[in-house]
Amino acid sequence: NYPFYAQAASVLGSQLVRGRATSVGNVINASPLADTVTPLVACDAKLVVVGPEGQREVSLVSWAGESQEERIARGAFFIFVRKVGLKPGEMAIGLKIPYVEGQKAVFTKFDRRKEVDLSTVCATVGKFGEDYRVAIGSCAPTPIRLPKTEALLKGKKLTPELIGEAAELAGSEVSPISDVRASAEYRISLV
């Protein structure tokens, strides 16, 4: 039901890492360039945690343009680079990934090498019911969804013109940094 998640998992790290890593571990790491996180964000997945106050589900979705304070206020999991919304004593025990009948999505990763490289940009784009969802990694302090781009696409049939318009809008919604992997401008062009 989630071939786009399998696509992301197939390019995660080395074969040794893929054999030892867990999906929850990749989420808990809270890296904005974690390959398997954008498919989960696109699916509206929730992290299941347990702690002194019992069990709860925490949203993995962060929105483009959302501040740390806004993420904390709504109880999001990803707050900033390697900063998460777990309460003291809480531990992750699983993921809850909703399924939408007929969902279709694709994962893509841009990097400098074919294997064992961190993402320059990674993305999951798909249609879930009537909604299009666009999740981007490596272009903000957390993996993010692009609400303006999603709103533009909602309920519409894709055409080359609409895709071009959505791509332009998506580039304007991200705010990447320049680092050793790529300049901010290059990342925006990839989006």
Task: Annotate each predicted stretch with a short phrase.
Residues 1-191:
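C-terminal structural segment of proteins
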